Amino acid sequence: MKKQFRAGAAAGLLAAVSLFSAVLLTGCSEEKKPVVSAETAEAVTESASEAGVWPGDENRIVLKLASTLSPEMRALNALSGFAEEVFRETSGRIDIQIYDSSSLGDQVDYLNGIRQGTVEMCLVSTAALEAIDPHFVIFGMPGLFTSAEKVNRFYESDICRELLDEFRQKSGIRSLALFHDGIRNVWLKEARVYRAEDFAGLRLRIPTGVRIREKEFQALKAEVVPLPLSDCSAALQSGYIDGLENNVETIVNSDMIGQIDYQVKTEHAYSTLLLLINEQILMQISENDRNILTDCARKYSGIAFQQYMEGQEAAYRAAEQAGIETIELEEKEKRRIRESLLSATKEMLEDIFPEGFYEKVDAL
């Protein structure tokens, strides 16, 4: 299990952190790796000492942040900066520990954990949130979000704010910030797809607990296989799946990259992530530190967005350099696929939203 977490540099502080973390993370005995820079740790240690705030004091709060992403992913890099700045600006009173690479399970585990309070924070896809609130299906509707800018407009809109507020009241989970995962395409080992009919019979991995993806590819007569992301490499290698749908950055920063032969540019959906926190735990933090936490979340969401926009071309280039051939679908085939996916999933909206909701979001 790989863990990254915040800690002070001074020996006395580090010992206290280790003891405190051991109590919180019962059963997690692997070596811990501090990721706070030495300069930050020294400055925070001095500041905390002057303020009388020490690790282990009741004023010190440790927040576990779980993610399926690997450390190379831009969103996770931004979260590391977020955690460090929160640690520094609160003089060590808030210590955010990042558990990457599915080390605490998959997204379903995180959502269960954050409601139970065993995981305080997580970064999960909006598609995964559909399992506990069907309203999040809107984020993944085929062809609805065709650009990062449109996604941002929706997230900042009154429509989305109302959705997130209702979600917070019902679930006890607050969204702190939006992160971009990007356009989703289909990635295949050996098999090729040029037409909608070519999906028939293909075993395609979809994320666990995401009904919209299931409906989409069942509409194309593919055999959908729900799997955690961490199981995909072995599933490809064994032939258990023929491929998966995902964004380019996830593929090139995983060990799947050496097993995939083709990228089919379906561009069927746009993938987004939300940084979530347990509302009850957030409200236990002092108002000043709570403001620091929420402001830093928004700041590093913006940083991650700029990095995402700058890094997309490099990610696609990395896929090409790895020997992955891109299959550009003819526009009429791409349109047929999207229409098929939309037809299969739009009925989900009718059971959840008032008439005209899709069109209202589409017009943003």
Each predicted region: which residue ranges?
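Gram-positive cell-envelope targeting signals
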Residues: 1-47
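N-terminal secretory/targeting leader peptides
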Residues: 28-149, 159, 168-169, 174-364
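Short, compositionally biased "basic patch" segments
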Residues: 163-164
